Amino acid sequence: MSAPSETLLPVRLLPPCLLIVTVEVDIEVEADWNRWYDDVHLPDALACPGVRAGRRYVSSGEVSESDRGEQRRLRTRLYTTVYELDAPSAVETKEFAAMRGWGRFGPRVRSQTRVVVAVG
């Protein structure tokens, strides 16, 4: 059963493509990174051709993840943004390539990006 603070969203058809970005952020830069992401990066990404929507999520505390049978516990919060795209080519536009700012956080922000394409 869902916690009272959660909202059940209606089921929708999978868009043609999803871009899923998962990020670990060191606590020392977390507030600055969140300001930049919310005020600059996310609006810039949503303005790119072929990007339909984006939604951010954050873990409530430590998380455990497994990859190919290996399990690890993260002591940092885990951020995930899911973007709905018209096609995988949306990440290849000049507007998407022109987005800047991620590098200023250097090794304090570690990310993994996946593109998921709907079949059928």
Role assignments for model-derived ranges:
Residues 1-120:
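Macromolecular interaction modules
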